[in-house]
Regions:
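Charged, alpha-helix-forming regions
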Residues: 1-207
Length: 207
């Protein structure tokens, strides 16, 4: 039976199918922040692919804890990059399908913000949650304040396995899930720049 997440988790919660998070893990931090701000609005409303979700630079700055002058550029760049993103899957009949996250982006210079138009396929993914589509949830404000490149990914993994009391991950899986560059094959770099930095920030800023 599907869960009515609009009732249980309002727009200040981040609720995503686990497979959706796997698709967006290669995005930049600013793209992920924009996605995190926009998706709860898509989940809790009845918008279609013809309806925009507006994210202002002032809201982006406030929720992410960054300066407004930085937010203008970060939001526009993230909007542009998110528009180029797509993900793929293989249908039951063997067809290989590619889907864009967004069908249109309008940067409203006079209003200092971006209008995002999600595709119908993505809107369905953002609203469909049941036993066949497991999901992970956490407060939006927690992850938006994380500033290290991989802290958000680590936090999602921790929340995904929270009911188990912890989790183990191999180095190969860590590289795949975080899409780490080859430079982190050196264990010292991996520990200092990814694991230690992300753990320190998430432990300090999250539940």
């Amino acid at each position: 039976m599907a869960v009515d997440l609009r009732k249980h988790y309002p727009k200040d919660w981040m609720v995503l199918q686990n497979r959706v998070t796997e698709c967006y893990r290669g995005m930049s931090l600013d793209e992920k922040r924009l996605f995190i701000m926009a998706t709860p609005l898509a989940r809790t409303t009845q918008i279609s692919s013809n309806d925009p979700i507006f994210i202002s630079s002032s809201d982006y700055a406030q929720e992410c804890g960054i300066d407004i002058s930085t937010a203008y550029t970060a939001l526009e760049t993230a909007s542009d990059r998110l528009f180029t993103r797509f993900f793929g899957y293989t249908a039951q009949n063997g067809d290989r399908v590619k889907v864009r996250w967004l069908q249109k982006v309008i940067y409203k210079a006079g209003q200092g913000g971006s209008e995002l138009y999600f595709t119908d396929e993505v809107l369905l993914l953002l609203r469909e949650f049941d036993a066949l589509n497991p999901y992970t949830k956490y407060k939006k404000e927690v992850v938006l304040r994380l500033k290290k490149d991989y802290s958000l990914d680590l936090y999602h993994l921790a929340k995904k396995h929270q009911a188990m009391g912890g989790f183990q991950i191999s180095l190969d899986d860590l590289f795949e899930q975080f899409e780490l560059p080859e430079s982190y094959k050196r264990i010292g770099n991996l520990k200092d720049r990814v694991i230690k930095a992300s753990l320190t920030e998430t432990n300090h800023n999250s539940d």
